[in-house]
Amino acid sequence: KVSALDAKAKALANEEDEDTKIAKLLKNMPKWRFYSLAVLTVIWTVFQLYIKLVKPLDPWFQLPLHMCLALVVVWLYNPMVEKSKSHNKLWWIYDIFLIASSCFICWFFLSHAEQLNYRIFNVDVMTTTEVIVAVLLVINVMEAVRRVVSMSLFWVICFFLAYAWFGQYIPGLFRFSGISFPKLMEVLMYGENGIFGSPLVTSLGTLFYFLVFGTFFSNCGGGGVLIDGGMKLSDKTVGGPAKAAVISSGLLGMVSGSAIANVS
């Protein structure tokens, strides 16, 4: 029979395993990458706190900077050279291209912020430069999804992109009139549900602070407090240890963003 102490120890072990995994990865990381990540994350945090507590900036300044910093952190934290079994230096060219293209995308939006404020979606025609930026943006986001999330989501995105392009050739119920390539890029980049739409706005205004708070809370011992609270709520009930594990993991997930990872 699992005791209450065993349930508490298991919940703490799950939390520590994730921290140990990250700590091990950072320890084995080359120093230049480690310090680059440290500097970037500090700059990112200061930038986010500034626009939240001091002075909000133009959306076309905030969103591209948020996106660029996130992408560069992904490329440094998950380099392609470590994903491949062979340590081929040519993979670094791909990572350098991704970092450079992320910065180019950010520069484009920052330098055209004023014009973009007056741009009318579905009315203004996409310029050649905008199409190129949109293509680079889609490549960067899809590669970030592939490295950080999963290949399954990557292929789901590929499927729907292919459907948007080839849907006009599909017979039957799923056929539609089709969409031009520049128009598709406009929807993906400028659309309300596109890359610079509500998903990125939510990440900028809510998700980032949620994750930062959860990290500080857990590293300051807050996870143990939530686990103790879960134990107290269920210690006198039938199946108390199991309930304590679920309650504690749910409470911890509310601030860490990973409830499922803590329930096992």
Show where each model-derived region lies.
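Residue-identity detector for threonine
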Residues: 20, 41, 45, 127-129, ...
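Generic amphipathic alpha-helical segments used as scaffolds and interaction surfaces in large
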Residues: 30-33, 123, 145, 200, ...
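Structural signal for alpha-helical transmembrane segments and their membrane-water exit/capping regions
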Residues: 46-54, 73-82, 102-117, 125-133, ...
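Conserved, well-structured core domains of diverse proteins
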Residues: 1-124, 131-135
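A generic structural signal for ordered alpha-helices
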Residues: 14-28, 85, 123, 140, ...
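Membrane-embedded alpha-helical segments and adjacent helix-loop junctions characteristic
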Residues: 117-118, 138, 158, 166-264
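Residue-level signature of transmembrane alpha-helical entry/exit and packing/kink sites
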Residues: 95, 99, 130-134, 153, ...
